[in-house]
């Protein structure tokens, strides 16, 4: 009992007297996050009041982690992304496609894009592959990481592309990710 009391007293002395400044500084830390918003630009007119540049309404599709399945639920995430991709393609909308991989007509996976983008894809934060990994190695690692088994190669690449974009842009509660810009009102209504 005396040993336990002595140990507790020593810890209290260490926290309250010896390392007081360190623990006080840790107690006073603040956490904050920044959300960037694009401001609307006003109309630009000439000296006579004639419009040179006007505003128009545009829609963006933004994924927000608060309303998206958790990282553990890859199957549900993939289903949502698959449905969004089908909707975008049906309505001929463009969406984020930054994955530096493509599938050729013969079905082979090839690199596409800049060397820096390919190196980023292979790094430890993304697919965690060695620099000498082939395009097929990257594709297979993407399928495994995002659990995209069960889809054909072309569809898996499209889903993997959006999942890669979410990872690349650090998708989280504080950081929503835009996957499509300037989409039609019809597409927004369908979502």
Model-predicted segments: where are they?
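Membrane-proximal periplasmic segments of bacterial cell-envelope enzymes
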Residues: 1-191
């Amino acid at each position: 009992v005396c040993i336990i009391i002595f140990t507790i007293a020593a810890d209290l002395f260490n926290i309250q007297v010896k390392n007081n400044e360190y623990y006080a500084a840790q107690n006073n830390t603040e956490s904050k996050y920044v959300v960037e918003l694009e401001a609307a630009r006003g109309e630009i007119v000439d000296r006579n009041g004639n419009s040179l540049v006007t505003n128009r309404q545009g829609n963006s599709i933004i994924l927000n982690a608060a309303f998206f399945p958790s990282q553990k639920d890859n199957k549900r995430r993939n289903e949502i992304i698959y449905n969004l991709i089908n909707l975008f393609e049906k309505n001929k909308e463009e969406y984020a496609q930054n994955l530096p991989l493509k599938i050729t007509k013969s079905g082979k996976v090839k690199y596409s894009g800049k060397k820096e983008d390919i190196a980023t894809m292979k790094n430890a934060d993304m697919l965690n592959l060695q620099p000498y990994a082939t395009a097929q190695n990257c594709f297979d690692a993407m399928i495994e990481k995002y659990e995209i088994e069960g889809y054909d190669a072309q569809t898996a690449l499209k889903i993997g592309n959006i999942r890669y974009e979410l990872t690349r842009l650090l998708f989280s509660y504080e950081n929503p990710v835009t996957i499509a810009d300037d989409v039609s009102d019809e597409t927004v209504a369908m979502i």
